[in-house]
Swiss-Prot record:
<keyword id="KW-0411">Iron-sulfur</keyword>
<dbReference type="GO" id="GO:0047113">
    <property type="term" value="F:aldehyde dehydrogenase (quinone) activity"/>
</dbReference>
<keyword id="KW-0479">Metal-binding</keyword>
<protein>
    <recommendedName>
        <fullName>Aldehyde dehydrogenase gamma chain</fullName>
        <ecNumber>1.2.5.2</ecNumber>
    </recommendedName>
</protein>
<keyword id="KW-0408">Iron</keyword>
<dbReference type="GO" id="GO:0051537">
    <property type="term" value="F:2 iron, 2 sulfur cluster binding"/>
</dbReference>
<keyword id="KW-0560">Oxidoreductase</keyword>
<comment type="subunit">
    <text>Heterotrimer composed of an alpha, a beta and a gamma chain.</text>
</comment>
<dbReference type="GO" id="GO:0046872">
    <property type="term" value="F:metal ion binding"/>
</dbReference>
<keyword id="KW-0001">2Fe-2S</keyword>
Length: 24
């Protein structure tokens, strides 16, 4: 699962299972 979102104004790209979207 490839998810692309913005963190602290930065573009972050992660490839993880849906249950690990809790990234801090």
């Amino acid at each position: 699962m490839n998810v692309q979102f913005t963190v602290n104004g930065r573009a972050a790209s992660i490839d993880v299972p849906p249950n690990t979207l809790l990234v801090q």
